[in-house]
Amino acid sequence: MQIKKDDNHQELDKYNHMSLQKILAISGKPGLFELKIQTRTGFVAESLLDGKKITVGMKSNVSLLSEIAVYTYNEEVKLAEVFKAIATKENEGPAISHKEDNAVLVNYFREVMPEFDEDRVYPSDIKKIVNWYNMLQAKGLISIESLNQEVKKQAAE
């Protein structure tokens, strides 16, 4: 299948094929970032919120979304699987607001991931996960199909 590309389609195509392995959460910085290039002293990342590029040093506390997992009573579940569960519940639409009351967020998360370990997954964690999901969903980066591929890719690693 060939896709005709113009500026608008390239942007959409780029995002639809973007892996969670290129999406970063940087401690102390709001939002999520796409890893652009690695440098000798760190890397350059682009904000998914405003598109601004920043340089991040090696000493910064950075997490790849592909490396984040949620504790359950049996195992750790990769974030891609959590996003897939939210996307399934919301029919690929937005989740509730991360600004909801903690009790509302915990109840929502219990619907999505009934087996999550409530002693080790805090409301602040749920807030971040819901916020990240909504950011990615607003950018068109959330689809059950792409998350299925992400889950398969991570399982193979």
PLM-predicted stretches and their roles:
Residues 17-97:
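The feature represents the first ordered module of a protein
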Residues 7-8, 52, 58, 141:
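Intrinsically disordered, low-complexity regions
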Residues 104-157:
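C-terminal charged interaction modules
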Residues 8, 16, 61, 74, ...:
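Detector for Asparagine
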Residues 72-76, 95-102, 119-126:
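Conserved phosphate/pyrophosphate-binding and hydrolysis machinery centered on Walker-type P-loop NTPases
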Residues 1-17:
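N-terminal amphipathic/basic-hydrophobic helices that include classical n-h-c signal peptides
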